[in-house]
Amino acid sequence: MAEGNNKEEVIHLNNFPCHRGKEWMAVREGPITISDSSDEEGIPMLVTPATEQQEDDLDDDVILTEDDSEDEYGGFLDLESGKKEGEAKPGPSSKQTADDIVNPRLEQKVIILGENGLLFPESEPLEVQNQSSEDSETELLSNPGEPAASVDDQLIGEEYWLDHPYFQAPNPQPQERTNQVVPQERHSESEMGPMFFRHDFPEPAFPRPEPQQEGIPGPASPQPAHPLGELEDQQLAIDEDPGPAFPLSGPQEANLANMWEQEAAEVDQDLIPLLVKETEARFPDVASGYVEEIIHLKNYYDLNVLCNFLLENPDYPKREDRLIIHPSSSLLASQDDAKLPKIDFFDYSKLTPLDQRCFIQAADLLMADFKMLSSQDIKWALHELKGHYAITRKAFSDAIKKWQELSPETSGKRKKRKEMNQYSFIDFKFEQGNIKIEKRMFFLENKRRHCRYYDHQALLPAVKQEQEFYEQKIKEMAEHEDFLLALQMNEEQYQKDGQLIECRCCYGEFPFEELTQCADAHLFCKECLIRYAQEAVFGSGKSELSCMEGSCTCSFPTSELEKVLPQTILYKYYERKAEEEVAAAYADELVRCPSCSFPALLDSDVKRFSCPNPRCRKETCRKCQGLWKEHNGLTCEELAEKDDIKYRTSIEEKMTAARIRKCHKCGTGLIKSEGCNRMSCRCGAQMCYLCRVSINGYDHFCQHPRSPGAPCQECSRCSLWTDPTEDDEKLIEEIQKEAEEEQKRKNGENTFKRIGPPLEKPAEKVQRVEALPRPVPQNLHPQMPPYAFVHPPFPLPPVRPVFNNFPINMGPVPAPYVPPLPNVRVNYDFGHMHVPLEHNLPMHFGPQPRHRF
C-alpha cells in the first residue's frame, strides 16, 4: 500500500483462483505481506483465516475497521444493487465474536460474501447480551477443537495494524453497520443493568441523533477504533435490545440525561463566570451571588435570557453599597477611557527623573546621534532635562537646525552641508513654561570616533519607549510639514493660474481644498465655518448650522462639519443637537438630576427620580429636588417646614432663582445682562423678562411714547426697556418679605430671624479731602526765594522783543513744568540767582513783570 494512502485494504476471497480450503491451508502458517509497491515497504498486514462456523463452513468473513469520521457513518455498502433483500443470511463467525470480546470499543463491520461474491445484508435486528469480557473469554477458550489463544492473538494483531493511520482511507465511504451476536447465555436486565460507554476524550455536550438507513439498527454515534492498550481501563457497554438512537425510554433515557447534564456542567464551568461578569456589568446594583444562583436554579445559560429575567423582575436583591460601580460597566466607558493617552515625553512638567542606568543608555545614544558635540555638554543637558532621551534629543535637534539656518556661509556659493570647525558653536536653548535652560556649546574639532551602540532589544524599557516615541513624533512632524508645504505650493499654483475661489462670507480668495460647502454647494472658507459654529454652539446654544448665504435655507452636512470643525466644537455641537432632539420629543418627561445634571426620561405621574448615572445613583423628589429618603411620607411643604435650616435654604434658593428666567418650552435658564425685555431662547421660544409669559413679537410691550423710566399713563403693559438689576432686586425683596411675614405669623415676633443675606450697613461718609499741594522736587541745592511781586509805579509801553533789544532786567520766559524723572534724584530745576522771576505764573499770563532794583 502506498505511503500516505489511508484507505483500507479489502480482501475478496472469491477472487482467488483455487478453492479456499486447499492452497490457503498450505500457507496459513506464515504471514502474508500485502504492498502496492515493491519499492516501498509499509507496515505488514497479517491475514489469518477465520474460524469456520458450525452452521455454514463455506462462507468466510472479512473484518473491516470503521473510520474515525463523525460526519460520515452509518452508510450502506452496495456491492450489487440487484440483490434481493429477502434472501437468507448466515450468522456471524466465532472469530468476529472473539474480536468483539477482546476489543469492545472497536466497532467492526461484517460483510458476508457468498460463493458468487454477492453481499448478504442482514435485515433482522439481533440481540446483544450484556456480558463481561472475562466471561466471554472463558467461554471461548473452553471450546474444544479451536486454538482460541492463537486466534485471539492473530485477531488483535490484525486489528491493530488495520487501525494504523497508514491504512486509513483519506475519503472514507459510508458503510453499513451491523450489530454482533455472541451466542451466550442470556442474563436478565435486572442483574446486569443498562451500562453506557463514555469516552475519555471530550465530546459535544449534546450529541445529535444518528440517521437510520434501511431500518438497520445501530449505535447512536460511531465509536472510533483505538489500540488495545488504551482500552484496558474502559467498560464494555452492550445494549440488550438495540434500537434506534432516538428516542430512548425508561432507565436508558434517565442515564443518558444524567450523562448529558454531567458533560454540560463540565462545559459550563467556564461559561458561568463570564455570564456573571457580563450581567453584573449591565446590572451593577444586583446582589453578589444572585446571578449565579439564578443560572443554576433556572438553567439560564444565555446572557439575553438573564437580562430579560432581571428586567421583568426589578425587585431582585440589590447590594447594599449601590454607589460602588462595576469597573467594567459600559456606562463608565467613554471615548477618552477607551484608549488611554500615551505619555507626552516632550512635556517637561509631566516627566520624572530616571535612574542611573537609563541615564547612561540615553547619554550613549545621544553621543552616537551628535558626534560633533562634547560628551560633557550632552551629559549636562541630559541631567538638566531629568535624564529623558526624547526631550533632550529634540532640544539638540532644534538647536542644530537653528544653527544651520543662521550660521554664515564661508563662500558665496551655497553648500549642501555646512563645514564645522572648532570655532563653531550652537546656542542650546530650552524654554517651556517657567523652565529656561541656555548654554553655548562648541563643536569638536573632529567627529567622535568611538561610540557605544545598543541593539533595540538591549535597551531598557523606559529608554526604548522614549526612542519609539521620538521617532513617531518626528515622523508625524515631518508629514505635517510636507502637508503644509504642499498646501502652500498648491495655493501658489492656484494664484498663478488665476483659479482662486471667493468665499461667500468673508469674500477672501482661497484654493478649492481650503473651502467647504453647504448642501446647496455654496462655498465658504474653513475659518468662517469654524467661527460661525463656535458662536452658534457656545454663544447662542443652537445646534442648527444653516447656510451663511442669505437666501439659502440649507444646512451644512455632517461630513463637512467633521472634516472642518475642531473636536471641542464638534462634540459640543453633537451635545446641543442631542439635547434639542430629546427635549423636542420628550419635553414633559425629560428630568435632570439635581446633583449631577444627568438627563433621563420619567413619566409625568412619577414623583421619585432615580438617577441612572452610575456615579450618582441618588433618589430625589421630582418637584422639590430633595432626597427621597427624607421626603418619604411628607409633602414638599411639610418637608421644607420640618427643618428650619432647610426652610431658610429653600427660600434663599428661590431668591437666587429669581434672577434666572427659565424657558417655558425647553427649561433652559436665561439671565439678562443688557438689552430689551424680549428674551429669545435657543429653542426659538420667546418670553417677557418681566412677567415671564410666552410672547410672540413686540406686541406684548407698551407702544405709547413716554419718558424713560416713567410708567405709562395710558396702559399697564410691560415696558420694553428696563434695568434688569432693579427688576431682580424688586422681585427678591417681594419673596423675602413674604417668607418673613409667614415666619412671624407661625413663630411669633420673638423668634423672628431674617431670611436672606444680612443687611448691608450704609457706607460711612468720608470727609472730603482737599487736593494735595503740588509736590515740590527736593533739589540738591536750595532754591532762592523769589522777590516780592511789586507793581510798577507807572505803565510803560510794551516793547516787542527782538533778538537784540531784550531789556536788561528781563530774563527768558521759563518753560512749562516737567515732572521729575523717576530714577533721577536731582531735578536740576534751579532758579537763576540774579534774575528774580515768578515761576508759578501760568503760561497765558504773558510776559514777566518788571522789577525795580
Curated annotation (Swiss-Prot):
Modification note: Auto-ubiquitinated.
Location of cross-link Glycyl lysine isopeptide (Lys-Gly) (interchain with G-Cter in SUMO2): 89, 339, 342, 413, 418, 436, 447, 473, 607, 646, 654, 753, 761
Binding site for Zn(2+) 1: 503, 506, 525, 528
Keyword presence, DNA damage: no
Name of protein: E3 ubiquitin-protein ligase RNF216
Positions of region (TRIAD supradomain): 499-716
Coiled coil: 463-479, 725-751
Places the protein is found: Cytoplasm; Cytoplasmic vesicle, Clathrin-coated vesicle
Gene giving rise to this polypeptide: Rnf216
Enzyme class: transferase
